[in-house]
């Protein structure tokens, strides 16, 4: 009994659903209210609330070419487009084409090449060439080849064991000592001549040995 009393006291504070709807808090609206509203923002409808279906159909189907209009009048004036705006990208293309045509002029190309040559010659004249930068060409004056102490020591060791070198051994020594094959060959020839002068004798055996050595040098 007490629980029912408290429940009635609680629900009596709030109005019923019928009283709420009858007072107009939630006005009844049907689906026809959306169609009857003349001002629907976002769809751009006419004040009458309906679209001119007849005029639209006539504009679409009256002419077959209307589906692909060629005139820029199809764009509204609100976009700020006119007939000249569609040709805005033509001018850069024409400028590039004209520049390419001008680049093919032989007189201008020759003048540009001449200016480039003059600038290169001017830059070369300002460069300072050191002796170690010069190439060893045919026009260079041939001088005496100097060998370092290490190179001379290694060549003397090799000459002590072999007075004549094979081509393979000559290439190996040239690679180790950072010399050319021709330099190794010339050094051994000069060293053999020096050795012959030091050990020169009048014995026939020595003369025959010298002849044999000269023949071997000619074969090389």
Swiss-Prot record:
Motif Antp-type hexapeptide boundaries: 129-134
DNA-binding region: 140-199
Keyword Transcription regulation among record annotations: yes
Gene Ontology MF annotations: DNA-binding transcription factor activity, RNA polymerase II-specific; RNA polymerase II cis-regulatory region sequence-specific DNA binding; RNA polymerase II transcription regulatory region sequence-specific DNA binding
Domain of life per record: Eukaryota
PROSITE patterns with a match to the protein in the record: ANTENNAPEDIA, HOMEOBOX_1, HOMEOBOX_2
GO cellular component, one term: nucleus
Span list, region Disordered: 197-220
Family, similarity comment: Belongs to the Antp homeobox family.
Name of this chain's protein: Homeobox protein Hox-B7-A
Organism: Xenopus laevis (African clawed frog)
Chain's gene name: hoxb7-a
